[in-house]
Amino acid sequence: MKKAFLISFTACMLSLLSYSQTRFNGLDMNMGNLYRLSDAKTRSISPENLTGEKGKAGMADPVDKDKQNVANASNAARDLGTGWKVNPYIRIKPGETFTMAVIDGPGAIQHIWMTPTGNWRFSIVRFYWDDETEPSIECPVGDFFGMGWGSYAPLVSAAVCVNPGSAFNCYWVMPFRKKCRITMENIDDQNSMTLYYQVDYTLTEVPADAGYFHAQFRRSNPDEPSIHAINDGIKGKGQYVGVYLAWGVHNNGWWGEGEIKFYIDGDSQFPTICGTGTEDYFCGSYDFDTNRKNQAGVAESNYTEFCTPYSGLHQVIRGDGHYNVMQRFGLYR
């Protein structure tokens, strides 16, 4: 039996009752509706405006250099003063949790950009909707953005983009009705982390049928008894919207014959949906191998990375025969 190291991050939208709304509320903006006007208000939270309030950005003063996360770049801005990138980032000490954003609704997050330093597996991002005391999203920041192996690889998709050199971008629309709270915890017990970030959101009416964004993080090491639960324990009406896998191989041979199965609404022995193989589920085929020819004209077997708007094999860590021995893969759909 093959053993594998497998990490998964999944996301879903849990919906409420449906409701018809004809007036455009400014949500779900795209190239096809940019001409439509609404009463939505655009706001953005960053270290330069930690509340997102109107007319309150860029107010950090270098004289506050001794206050944590108030004027972190005061030395670089010492000759420029207020209004000149005095606090573009925050620092999170070992074991500390920093509140990145608190937003009063109704509204929706439309885009998040961040570039965290340190060990991405040791940085835990959490999202709380409305009056929640337990988070709907709790995930290492690297896995949330498709970088579960802690090293950069280009990722270009409709929902998540990771750009040089470590710019994490998320375009999931995440509505809330009363409140949104986002935190980042540094569970590294030795090193502080530096975080540049921006949370772009809109304040507007939210349809009654809008769901709340949820995500589960799971890790199996090794994957025994060869069954890894990607999603489990979800109840109620909802919509499965995606998965990211960080897959490590411990043995020789092709690793991707595992079938993705969906057990829905009471399924027990047999699922409702069953795929034909791992690479097939991620919209590839035949081991992700294109048998490209080398300079001598001989076909060589090798993995081919790819990114598309909705699926991809964006990362292949092939090993160097030295300290990085195992092959590792990053896949999304």
Residue positions per predicted region:
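Positively charged n-region of N-terminal signal peptides that target proteins for export
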Residues: 1-4
